[in-house]
Amino acid sequence: MSDLLFPVPESWAKSAWIDNDVYRRMYEQSISDPEGFWGEQAGRLDWFQPWMKVKEGSFDGDVRIRWFSGGKLNVSYNCLDRHLVGRGDQIALLWEGDDPAVSRSLTYRRLHEEVCRFANVMKSLGLRRGDRVTIYLPMIPELAVAMLACTRIGVVHSIVFAGFSPESLRERIRDCQGRVVITADEGLRGGKPLPLKENADEAVGKCPFVEKVIVVRRTGSQIPWTSGRDFDWEGLMQEASADCPPEEMDAEDPLFILYTSGSTGKPKGVLHTTGGYLLFTAMSHQHIFDYHDGDIYWCTADIGWVTGHSYTIYGPLANGATTVMFEGVPNYPDWSRFWRIVDKHGVTILYTAPTAIRALMRQGDEPVRKTFRKTLRLLGTVGEPINPEAWLWYYNVVGEKRCPIVDTWWQTETGGILITPFPGAMALKPGSAARPYFGVKPAIMDSEGRFLEGTGTGNLVITEPWPGMLRTIYGDHQRFLDTYFSTYKGVYFTGDGARRDEDGDYWITGRVDDVINVSGHRLGTAEVESALAAHSAVAEAAVVGFPHEIKGQGIYAYVTLKTDRQPSDALRKELVSWVRREIGAIAAPDFIQWAPGLPKTRSGKIMRRILRKIAADDIADLGDTTTLAEPAVVDDLLKGRLAAAWE
């Protein structure tokens, strides 16, 4: 915990959308009268037909939540059409390529035309309302066009991060039964090509229900081509009309499926719907980032993750913002890249991850100080808790002590930000996520299911539904209930721990379930374990997180080999490469320890608490080990940890 406190500057209190008095008044109304509050706020969207009921359902029983029942609207209309009269010539999307010499801008009018054309392309291929499409694209403008085109005609998109492996892509295509896959010949990241079409071909080869593959020519490289199945994006767009009326969608119609890691190994298809999600992202984008006309807003997240969905595309465009989209990485061609983009485009609001901040901080101040950054007025962080040291560097060096930092907490499942400082309303505490957003009722519970009042540390739960939340796990509502509503009855269990201080501010302490937060991206330990165990040399594997100075958490794997295989550095490297191929680079173990056996209870359950402590080198007190079937295994692991440290 940091004892530092940064009061709200007087200029911010006067100019921000939300000051302290407004926050208290709006928050109180949102909790005491949610129907009245959200019904009033929904007026910021354009509706084809008004809703009959604002809110239905609770966190009890079968948990069927509905917002704005009977209302009809269209996401692309709210993000594009309604801005054409007043903002048609304003830049909607500023795209910065991997190569600093390459960039593009699309006005609202141009983006609207492109979206309508691609919506007509999809209709010409037989796609209709409710069909699913898998998008496997790099961070290029066509990704934004494709997702908005889906919303225009009621097609449900499932975007898969371009860094995922063919196997991970296949699993996601198969789960949602996507009829069409949209990909590129290659991606570019840090000057290196990514073989996206090759990966997509491998994935689609085992998905016979996929009818068409649409390919964007990003690099112009030679790629395999399946006649009758594969179609060229540009060729299709040239033949399509730029006139496509928006489909009138029910507020509770599915908008997108986004897969996130679960503790059981199989990724969960988080399903978000239309009206509540769009309202929540638009409102929170304006309020939390204090977005005003003329701001240039940049969220650095890849659209393959929820942050990119909500705060690169949907929230900003619903508000008529200019949003920056970046294809590359912070260190290419050098460590000043982020700050040069800020200067090049006049970025005023920057939203990035603690992992990136820590990596940039490690390079020292010089790459930052050689740039100007005078346009910046607000900074944000997302994906994981930020340590006070990184917070202070971000504030002092990047923002030059003039830019408030909004340290936001939320999840794929929540749709938008749930806990955050408001820059014009709250003093900032480095490392604290501060207060709940409107309509959000957080609480802290102990392991016995008791609510903790006042100060305390425990499991973070949300006690009432909010409009942006997921509605189910696609195709598996029971898993939705088991994952979020079985640990504690009648509340949403976040899977995160938290502490509430004497001021009522929240501090997120990290995951409490079998999920690792690597660079702000959630990975299920079971998913990595399954990949390791699929290797012919591995008998068993257990994976835990451990503190990592750059990523926040790293991946620590305990591997038991089959009796006919011997540990070696070559095998260790082979296993890391194997996981990269099976899941993606994000899941590659940082550390592999050879383990003769794993600590298991007599019922066969792995005691992960012990594995976490050993991985973190916190071995002074391993706790009660009397329930282990073979206590001697712990000594072997401790010796192995020590030996590995000296390798």
From Swiss-Prot:
InterPro entries: Ac_CoA_lig (IPR011904), ACAS_N (IPR032387), AMP-bd_C (IPR025110), AMP-bd_C_sf (IPR045851), AMP-binding_CS (IPR020845), AMP-dep_synth/lig_dom (IPR000873), ANL_N_sf (IPR042099). Keywords: Acetylation, ATP-binding, Ligase, Magnesium, Metal-binding, Nucleotide-binding. It catalyses: acetate + ATP + CoA = acetyl-CoA + AMP + diphosphate. GO terms for biological process: acetyl-CoA biosynthetic process from acetate. ATP binds at residues 383-385, 407-412, 496, 511, 522. The keyword Cell wall biogenesis/degradation does not apply. SUPFAM superfamilies: Acetyl-CoA synthetase-like. This is Acetyl-coenzyme A synthetase. It comes from Syntrophus aciditrophicus (strain SB). The gene is acsA.
